[in-house]
């Protein structure tokens, strides 16, 4: 509920669990220590992206460490950061206090970690950093580049964290 509250205060579309009670299950699952990966399947416009950002906010508050938000393209990444993610972070007093600086490809956090903002179209971004928590958005729009699958490359970034890593997609 605290994560949903952060999204609601962001000024964007509210994450209303009274209207979309089915989102509570994946949010609760993500917050359980024993759960490593949550896969959310659903139709268009049911709140999957808001759910993803609520889990990102919860992770910032309760799981310090490097995070990665994976998007299909640079354009979608830039649009989402400006229209959804940044307003959510600025709209929550708890999350706003954690942010040190916004950059094009990452958000620096005051605890010395970051939220890496990666795209599926860049093999170098998919292979350049190890992350504790991975947030995969719009994976059905990922284009295969080269021999590898963008989703598998992104998931591979969490391998060093073993059973402590978390993925939501």
PLM regions and their residue ranges:
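Phosphate/NTP-binding elements of NTP-utilizing enzymes
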Residues: 1-169
């Amino acid at each position: 509920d605290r994560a949903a509250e952060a999204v609601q205060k962001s000024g964007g579309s509210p994450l209303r669990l009274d209207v979309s009670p089915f989102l509570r299950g994946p949010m609760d699952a993500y917050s359980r220590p024993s759960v490593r990966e949550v896969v959310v399947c659903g139709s268009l416009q049911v709140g999957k992206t808001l759910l993803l950002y609520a889990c990102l906010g919860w992770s910032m508050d309760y799981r310090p460490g490097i995070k990665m938000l994976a998007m299909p393209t640079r354009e979608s990444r830039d649009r989402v950061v400006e229209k959804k993610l940044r307003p959510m972070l600025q709209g929550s007093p708890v999350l706003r206090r954690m942010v040190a600086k916004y950059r094009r490809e990452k958000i620096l956090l005051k605890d010395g970690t970051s939220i890496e903002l990666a795209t599926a179209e860049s093999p170098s971004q998919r292979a350049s950093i190890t992350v504790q928590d991975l947030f995969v958005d719009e994976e059905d729009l990922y284009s295969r580049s080269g021999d590898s699958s963008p989703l598998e490359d992104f998931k591979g970034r969490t391998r060093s964290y073993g059973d402590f890593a978390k993925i939501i997609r």
